[in-house]
């Protein structure tokens, strides 16, 4: 008999730090820069990748020291999760907080990121290097329906 996966038997608050970290599918969507309108606080999504994001692997080059390299890097925690309304509907943290299960392509279910990349969930097919961008406003993406 197989054991029920931890994400189905524990709440987000009950998970260990290692379990919490493993929920991240590594899609890189958090690592794309967002612009905020100073007057309306509206968030605009771009395809501009953080300098630390390896676009091919969708992994941070310096994850353990990312805040030293990128002071504006976000740290998603159990406490601040509700404030990140811009998280995509595919995000495991968002899904589990909403009482949903992980999608079939999630690396915790498949054992690899290949299915996630094949489903085009990751940013590897849209991300551009920050160093190659002159005007970030030229890289604003159409607002996803889920971000309404």
UniProtKB/Swiss-Prot annotation:
Any signal peptide, and if so, which residues?
none
Q: Report the InterPro entries cross-referenced here.
A: Puta_zinc/iron-chelating_dom (IPR005358), UCP006173 (IPR008228)
Where, by residue number, does the polypeptide cross the bilayer?
Answer: none
Q: Which domain of life is it from?
A: Bacteria
Family named by the database record: Belongs to the UPF0260 family.
HAMAP family for this protein: UPF0260
- What name does this protein carry? UPF0260 protein ESA_01462
- Organism whose genome encodes this protein: Cronobacter sakazakii (strain ATCC BAA-894)
Lineage at the top is: Bacteria, Pseudomonadati, Pseudomonadota, Gammaproteobacteria, Enterobacterales
């Amino acid at each position: 008999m197989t054991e029920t996966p931890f994400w189905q038997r524990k709440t987000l608050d009950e998970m260990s730090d290692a379990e919490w970290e493993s929920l991240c599918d590594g899609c890189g969507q958090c690592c794309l820069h967002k612009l905020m309108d100073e007057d309306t606080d509206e968030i605009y999504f771009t395809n501009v990748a953080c300098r630390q994001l390896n676009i091919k692997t969708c992994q941070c080059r310096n994850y353990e020291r990312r805040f030293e390299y990128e002071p504006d890097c976000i740290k998603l925690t159990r406490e601040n999760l509700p404030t990140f309304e811009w998280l995509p509907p595919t995000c495991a943290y968002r899904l589990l907080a909403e009482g949903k299960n992980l999608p079939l392509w999630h690396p915790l279910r498949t054992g690899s990121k290949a299915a996630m990349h094949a489903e085009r969930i990751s940013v590897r097919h849209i991300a551009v290097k920050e160093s190659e961008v002159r005007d970030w406003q030229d890289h604003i993406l159409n607002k996803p329906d889920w971000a309404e």
